[in-house]
Amino acid sequence: MSYQIHQNQIPERLVSFEGKEYRWLGGTNYLNIGTHPLFQEKLQEGIRMFSQNWGSSRLNNYRMDVWESLEHTLAKRFQVEAAALCSSGLIAGQIALQYIMQKYPNAAISLAPKTHPALWRHPHKPAPGEFSEWKKDAQILCMDGIGAPWVEEFLTGFEQNLSADQTLIVDESHRLGIVSTQIQTPANLIQTSSLSKAFGIPAGIILGKKADIDAIKQDPFWVGGSPANPAYVYACLHAQEAYD
């Protein structure tokens, strides 16, 4: 039996329901970073500096350094060449997939079973059946880094046997900032993620090779989208110790 719990506060480790306390095991807010004093302090600073939001394109002639600073910080943290911030994890996934589909317009695409909708693109949907039955011979492969809400390992070694002419796009929303996201593969690897799950900010990110990220930052879908909220980006950038 399932329940809907209606409350006006973000849950922490425990939630109350019908007079009893239960452990909260939802698929977000993993670190409860919003309660960390350093994050709260830096978010307040960010709001004072950047007000409520900034919706202009990142390629506008008026630019702020805070976005690139966090991109460099997260690229270094996750040991990739470059990163591109987006307004959400779903947008990050869609932009990455759109970019690869334009780069290889005739390529076959295969989505693993249970892949998050962030990596869906009509008419392509996740393959039916179990992950072990998924055929991984398409040029573009999309999958989740780990199953959610039920934890399920997907990267079991097949990725090491892919070829260099394949592209593997992995949604890391439920691993990034929690466990290692290092993937050893000959394929061209692009990782996307929500930054709300562990990092606690309303944003998404694309991680990959510098050539891919540079090209994505010229793509109309990235250029035309509003950037991540700069106040939250500032908080994440200057509260990195809170995530360690």
Task: Enumerate the language-model features and the residues they cover.
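N-terminal "arm"/small-domain region of PLP-dependent enzymes with the aminotransferase-like
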Residues: 1-54
